[in-house]
Design a protein with these regions (language model features):
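N-terminal acidic, proline/glycine-rich, low-complexity intrinsically disordered segments
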Residues: 1-14
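Transmembrane alpha-helices and adjacent helix-loop boundaries
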Residues: 14-483
């Protein structure tokens, strides 16, 4: 209810008198200093508060029969789950750390992890991890059959990629955009040269043909931008200009691959373990996102041909299991190749995984595009932005922000799906670990469990890291939207 304004002189005098009494220091109930800050109740702060809010809050309602029944039931469920969690955690720690065998100083190999019943020195009933087995097979699990003298190349590729990725992720560092651009363009070329040895035998004539083609396409794009052609031909010229820059980058990559770096050539059949897992996962992640964005835009396009082709592509790849794609790429594709043409097995798997993941990524991005209000499109048209300008500056940034969880979920699924390449003869991390189990020199009842534990921990580290970083990006972008 609104207060009435003070008009008369007597009313103003009464107010002044009241105020003078209120601020009189002789009045005992008037506080002259701020009240001290009291600590929060135990149920609201600290570890006790966390326990109450997340565990005990659902078990403290005994004011009614229904509330008491619910509290008792939730308490029973909490006790059962807590018991299961504690016992399984202790069992895992005992298997992996407390009771595990950590070294084999006498070189006994499998006998180092044998019990007395099996002819070893460990007590009867011992069942824990055999880490000497992992130490002996670490090179194959992490690098495959890559030559030992050339492992520095793999480690250098890991180091450069990790430093550049960390540089991009840490906000306080300068030149993050430049480092990010180099990570997406120059680093793949560097990693390919280091891992394969370079010198692919590409002729100068081939590079010249691509260079001339790129210059022609760029010239067409310039003509369209200058207004010499208009309408549909103008749009086609603009697309040709963009393709020209892509072709000239491809020509530059071919020029680098034609240089002899005096490195030993390593066939991809010698790659394996964690190296293969990272190559397949990173290639699929980096290539599937832009391809998925283009497919999502094509499916929502007003052009019937683009919409039809994008829809057919997405529905085809989503309707086929990944293992079928890998089998087709490894077994059936060579049958359709010309005589004498040999397509690298790993490259075939990379193409199949990328196309498969791009179809799922397209649907995730399309969901983000549908979440954008129509007014955003109308606002972009009102300020005179072209289709690609509105997509790049207004629509896509908002759409991708909305679907960060879906994008990262697809990335995590792709990372775990790399284990399927072992079925077609490519030894990824899981395949390499499984192949080491056939070594009779390390045949023990626990070598399989130890190997699978290592693989599970590695997969968990990468997947959990991606999940946490996506949560960080969500919080960061949410704060920027709410400001």
């Amino acid at each position: 209810m609104a207060k009435k304004p003070i008009k008369s002189a007597s009313q103003r005098a009464n107010v002044k008198k009241t105020l003078s009494v209120a601020v009189d220091p002789q009045v005992g109930f008037v506080r002259t200093e701020p009240a001290p800050l009291l600590p929060p109740p135990p149920s609201e702060g600290g570890f006790t508060g966390w326990l109450y809010k997340n565990i005990f809050a659902s078990m403290s309602d005994f004011g009614s029969f229904g509330g008491a029944t619910k509290s008792i039931f939730m308490g029973f469920v909490t006790l059962v789950l807590s018991y299961f969690l504690v016992t399984q955690t202790l069992a895992l720690l005992d298997f992996a750390i407390f009771s595990a065998v950590w070294s084999d100083p006498k070189g006994l190999e499998r006998e180092a992890c044998w019990t007395v019943e099996q002819g070893g020195a460990l007590p009867a009933g011992w069942h824990a991890a055999c880490w000497p087995f992992i130490q002996a097979k670490a090179k194959f699990i992490f690098y495959g059959a890559y030559p030992s003298d050339e492992l520095w190349r793999v480690n250098l590729a890991y180091l450069v990629g990790s430093v550049m990725l960390a540089w991009v992720m840490i906000e306080r560092l300068p030149y993050r955009k430049i480092v990010g651009a180099l990570l997406l363009t120059a680093y793949p070329v560097l990693a390919t040269v280091l891992l394969t040895g370079g010198a692919f035998g590409i002729s100068t004539g081939t590079i010249g043909v691509y260079t001339i083609l790129s210059l022609a396409l760029i010239t067409m794009g310039r003509l369209g931008k200058a207004g010499y052609v208009s309408g549909a031909l103008g749009d086609l010229a603009s697309v040709a200009g963009v393709c020209g820059w892509v072709v000239i980058l491809f020509a530059a990559v071919l020029a680098v691959f034609s240089v002899d770096f005096s490195l030993e050539a390593i066939d991809t059949r010698d790659w394996g373990g964690l190296l293969i897992t990272l190559v397949v996962a990173i290639t699929g992640i980096v290539a599937s996102l832009p391809l998925g964005i283009l497919l999502a835009l094509g499916r929502r396009s007003d052009m019937p041909v683009a919409r039809f082709l994008s829809t057919v592509f997405i529905e085809f790849w989503r309707g086929v299991p990944l293992i079928t794609v890998l089998f087709m790429a490894s077994v059936m594709l060579p049958l359709f190749m010309p005589e004498g043409v040999n397509f690298d097995m790993l490259l075939r798997a990379l193409i199949g995984v990328t196309l498969f993941s791009a179809a799922y990524m397209a649907e995730v991005v399309r969901g983000g595009l549908q979440a954008i209000d129509k007014g955003q499109y109308e606002g972009a048209d009102a300020v005179g932005l072209s289709y690609w300008q509105s997509m790049r500056l207004i629509i896509l940034p908002q759409a991708l922000t909305h679907v960060i969880p879906g994008i990262v979920n697809t990335f995590i699924g792709l990372f775990k799906d790399t284990a399927l390449v072992s079925i077609v003869g490519i030894f990824d991390l899981l395949g390499a670990a499984q192949s080491t189990l056939a070594d009779a020199a390390w045949s023990t009842p626990v070598q399989g469990l130890t190997g699978y534990l290592v693989v599970a921990v590695i997969f968990f580290i990468f997947c959990f890291g991606m999940s946490r970083y996506s949560m960080f990006m969500e919080r960061k972008l949410s704060r920027s939207r709410n400001r």
